[in-house]
């Protein structure tokens, strides 16, 4: 996959990440972006979103607690992203349970742009039109055919698609990766997926190959999680240790420790 100094390039740029995200994990997303080396801006007012995207390095839209104002802001921001060539990451949190969120994704694809869709396996399979098991915002899916779902959805939206679970899957419609790092403790703290979406926005803001940048973001989260669990086996202390280890993560570490199968 060639030169893979994804984290180094991101930290050299210190990309400004415009986040329109949910109220549950907004603080976690801001803190993990800072620890990673990016600059977060949690700007969701619909009358500010268009202008702010024009000075941003990437736009992260998380649909977790989608209000009407956030919906309007997300659509306007995506239009600005298209006009100003700013990459967009979408996290379709809870889309199998709330069909309105699919309408919002399709509207963003129609009038704006989507570069990466990052969701759990249940959400991605649902968006791809495949049978999936979910409960609220959580996936109960066993991961069967997950890479196929990513590939189908990547072709539909002409973007990168990442599906997270016990294994993580990434596809650009032609190439793919399967990531086998991680720890179950990441499922015991609220917002691990939301934080990962923010990291995907940070890496894609400064690295051209978005399949590689997305894979690097997932490896960063998973390996930081593994290292955090070595020191902290309880959810509260683990959450703090996770951010500490994101602060210390490096390209050398993720590619040496990473268990990745390129497809």
Curated annotation (Swiss-Prot):
First-level EC class: transferase
Keywords: ATP-binding, Kinase, Magnesium, Metal-binding, Nucleotide-binding, Thiamine biosynthesis, Transferase
InterPro entries: Hyethyz_kinase, Ribokinase-like
Keyword field contains Ligase: no
Keyword Disulfide bond set for record: no
Catalytic activity: 5-(2-hydroxyethyl)-4-methylthiazole + ATP = 4-methyl-5-(2-phosphooxyethyl)-thiazole + ADP + H(+)
Amino acids binding ATP: 118, 164
Positions contributing to substrate binding: 42, 191
Pathway per the UniProt entry: Cofactor biosynthesis; thiamine diphosphate biosynthesis; 4-methyl-5-(2-phosphoethyl)-thiazole from 5-(2-hydroxyethyl)-4-methylthiazole: step 1/1
Role played: Catalyzes the phosphorylation of the hydroxyl group of 4-methyl-5-beta-hydroxyethylthiazole (THZ).
The family this protein is said to belong to: Belongs to the Thz kinase family.
Protein known as: Hydroxyethylthiazole kinase 2
Organism: Clostridium botulinum (strain Loch Maree / Type A3)
């Amino acid at each position: 996959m060639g030169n893979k100094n994804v984290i180094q390039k991101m930290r050299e740029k210190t990309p400004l990440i415009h986040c329109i995200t949910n109220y549950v994990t907004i603080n976690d997303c801001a803190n993990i972006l800072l620890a990673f080396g990016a600059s977060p801006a949690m700007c969701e007012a619909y009358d500010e979103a268009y202008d702010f995207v024009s000075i941003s390095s990437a736009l992260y839209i998380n649909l977790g607690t989608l209000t009407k104002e956030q919906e309007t802001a997300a659509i306007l921001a995506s239009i600005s992203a298209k006009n100003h060539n700013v990459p967009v990451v979408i996290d379709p949190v809870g889309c199998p349970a709330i069909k309105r969120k699919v309408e919002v994704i399709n509207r963003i694809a129609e009038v704006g742009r989507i570069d990466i869709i990052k969701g759990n396996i249940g959400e991605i399979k649902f968006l791809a039109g495949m049978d999936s098991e979910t409960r609220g915002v959580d996936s109960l899916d066993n991961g069967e055919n997950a890479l196929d779902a990513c590939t189908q959805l990547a072709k539909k939206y002409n973007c990168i698609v990442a599906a997270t679970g016990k294994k993580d899957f990434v596809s650009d419609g032609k190439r793919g990766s399967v990531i086998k790092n991680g720890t179950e403790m990441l499922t015991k703290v609220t917002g691990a997926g939301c934080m990962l979406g923010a990291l995907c926005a940070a890496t894609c803001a400064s690295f051209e190959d978005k399949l590689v940048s997305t894979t690097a973001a997932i490896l960063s989260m998973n390996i930081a999680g593994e290292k955090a669990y070595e020191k902290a086996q309880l959810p509260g202390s683990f959450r703090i240790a996770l951010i500490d280890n994101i602060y210390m993560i490096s390209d050398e570490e993720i590619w040496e420790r990473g268990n990745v199968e390129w497809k």
